Every structure is written in C-alpha cells, then in structure tokens.
Amino acid sequence: MEWKNASNNKKITALFLTFTFISSIGYVGIGYVVASQGISANPGCGMWESNTPDNWTTDDDWESFEPWNDSTERIEIRKNFDVSNYQYQYENVSFEPRGESGITLRGWYIEVDPNAPVVIQTHGMPQNGKCKPEMLLMQGYLAEAGINSLSFDLRNYGNSDVDSDYISIGQKEYKDLLGAYDWLISEKQYSPGEVGMTAISLGGGAAIAFADEPGIGALWLDSAVLDFPLVIKNELERLGFPSFFAGPGVRVGGWLAGVSLTERSPLEAAENAGDRPVFLTHGKEDPRVSIQHSQTFEERMISNDANVTTWYVEQRGH
C-alpha cells in the first residue's frame, strides 16, 4: 500500500512539473509573439528618407491606412495639402542621451527667432521619426508661429544610432529627450523654462523626461501612450485576441528590451507637473491608443491641482 501511494505521489508530481513546464513555455511563447510585434525596432526613414525640413512632401503608402471612419478624409487632405509654406532652413545636429555615452542621436534644429522659446518634438513608432510628414508639418507650424524647434530621432529610429533590436517604450528613450534638452541649454543657450516638448502616440513614454526635468516648461501630448500595459490590451482587443495576453507580452517585452516596461510610468509627469502647463489632445474613437490614456492622465493632474487643458476630438481615430 505504501509503495502504491509513493508511486501515485510520483505520478502527481511528474504531472504537475510537466504542466508547469508546458504552461511556462506557453506563457513565454505568447509573450514573445505579442512583444516582438509590439516593440521591434525599425530604424531608418523608409519612403521618407529624402524628406528634410526645407524639402519634403506628404507622400505616403496610402494603401497602409487602416479603414477607420476618417481614413478617406485624412488621405484626401494629405494628398491635396500644399506644404510649400511650411518648408524652412534647418541645422543638422547631434548629441548623446543624458548619462549615456556612445549613442549618437541626430536631429534637425530650426531657429526662426533667437529670442523665442523652443519645442522638442518626440515622434511615435514603428517606422517613424523626424522625417515623417506629420513631424515636418508640426515643425513648420511651430516655425510659422515664431517658435523654434528641435525634431530628432530617438535611439533605434530614423538616422540615430541603433543599440538594440527592440525599443523600450520610453524606459530608456526618455534619456534621449533629456539629452536634447541638455544640448539646447549648453549649445543654444536656452534657459530652463524656455524649452517645451511634444510627445505623439507611442512617443508618450518620453513624457517621463518631463517628470524628471523641471526645466522643461510645458508639455503637449497628442494621442499619447501613457500606460503601456493598457496599450497592449488596446492592441490585442483591436486585433481580436484575448486581452489577458497583455501580461506575458509586457513581461517578455521587458526581457527583450533589457528593462522592465513598467519600471517608470509617463503618469509620473502628471504627479510632478506642478504649475507647468500640459495640453492633452486625443481622438474619442481612437482604436489603437484608447482615450483612457489621456483621461487617466488628466484625472491625475486634476487631483494634483495641476495646470491641464484638454481637447478630445469627436469622431476621430488615431
């Protein structure tokens, strides 16, 4: 009888270990599929390689536009948009992330008024960067308004150095933005408070820089990712997959990127904003980065009696 009990216990233990092993493999496998698609680096500028601030077009891969409600309208606006009034002379610049040597970040600096403030532009992903029409148009709008700008490629994007096959959703990239700030202070003699920043889509992770650097005087967040686990859930739901896959995606993504993807949060900027102005804009029907990101950020700012303004746009996606 004792022999049979011992044999049964061994079988139960073996089954348990087998189940645990298979479950672990499945967890890692699911996480890898989710994370590798979500955070794979895609450096270079692709079809926009020839774009520069003084000579760019709105050309795009029109077939790649997803069938959102406003896609047709957006395509028509872009095809017929005259960019000639938004092309400006610029300076090629380079600098390193704050606290990290050996990584060169490359950007375009436009100065229209030596006495004006400056805005650092932070792009989204995947194949993205300073060369995309959206970023160049923003630089043109700022110049038209008499505001200087620095638009640059984060590490692993555009023409900046590649140090990994994966991006880290702001966990490392916020240091790139701090490097841009330091360059403006040291090389262009701006004073703290004269430098603002914008963050678009997945570039929202760089808002951590706003939390760390009180010299950044203002922040504009456009359809920004401010909660990485939430955006993974958003994307899984959009593609028709169970949202509980987000957990392994975040965990394995951290292993791939070499840093926990939840170590820092852009929501820290809402806690540390003080009286610095923050503007949030978001499409109410955004299927990729849900409006909940901006709403949560707004709520945090309000609870801290901070200076926040919002524009949530009806019938608009990402």
Model-predicted regions and their roles:
Residues 1-83:
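N-terminal targeting or regulatory segments adjacent to alpha/beta-hydrolase or S9 domains
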Residues 68-114:
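N-terminal cap/lid segment of alpha/beta-hydrolase-fold proteins
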Residues 116-124:
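Short beta-strand element of the alpha/beta-hydrolase
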Residues 139-161:
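Conserved alpha/beta-hydrolase
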Residues 167-188:
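Alpha/beta-hydrolase active-site loop
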Residues 209-260:
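Hydrolase active-site cap/lid region
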Residues 273-274, 279-282, 286:
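Short beta-strand/loop motif that positions the catalytic acidic residue
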Residues 287-293:
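Conserved alpha/beta-hydrolase "acid-adjacent" motif
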